[in-house]
Regions:
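Short, Lys/Arg-rich flexible segments
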Residues: 1-155
Length: 155
């Protein structure tokens, strides 16, 4: 049994399609990065305000000494949410650096507070919050891919 196969290929259409994709790629990458960076900042902020670690679980409890302090009594939430005035999480932002984005704290004092909370410097317990959990990491990959494909016209 012999089969005949004829393939018709329009090279002009293929070339134009590839040009369109390559033209839209830089903008698509930057916009997709901005979208996932905003999502990452939202997730870090939201989970921290709920007192959750990035991969689940709760932060180490406040010390008994802190629970007796005037500062603690002024606090709205009595669970560990790393918020006293709200300046640290409000200064969390992202910036585009070419084909990568970085998450950072806008003010130096908030950066220092975040480092102390995240690493547990001195007598402070470790309360890792400035990270992306596995579940959110997969969601970020999905958001990036869908937005990128939409903007480039792939698929």
């Amino acid at each position: 049994m012999v089969a005949d196969i004829k393939i018709k290929f329009n090279t002009i259409d293929a070339t134009n399609y590839l040009k369109k994709i390559s033209k839209n790629t830089p903008r698509a990458i930057k916009e997709s990065l901005n979208r996932v960076s905003a999502y990452a900042v939202d997730q870090i902020t939201e989970k921290t305000q709920k007192g959750q670690k990035p991969d689940g679980g709760t932060f180490a409890r406040y010390s008994e000494m802190y629970k007796q302090s005037k500062q603690f009594k002024k606090k709205e939430n009595k669970f560990v949410d790393l918020k006293f005035h709200g300046h640290m999480l409000n200064s969390l932002a992202w910036a585009n650096r070419g084909y990568k984005n970085i998450l950072f704290f806008r003010r130096k004092t908030e950066q220092i507070k975040a480092y102390i909370h995240d690493t547990g410097v001195g007598k402070m317990p470790t309360r890792p919050f400035f990270a992306i959990g596995k579940k959110d990491e997969n969601k970020i990959k999905d958001i990036f891919a869908r937005h990128y494909y939409k903007l480039t016209g792939i698929r």
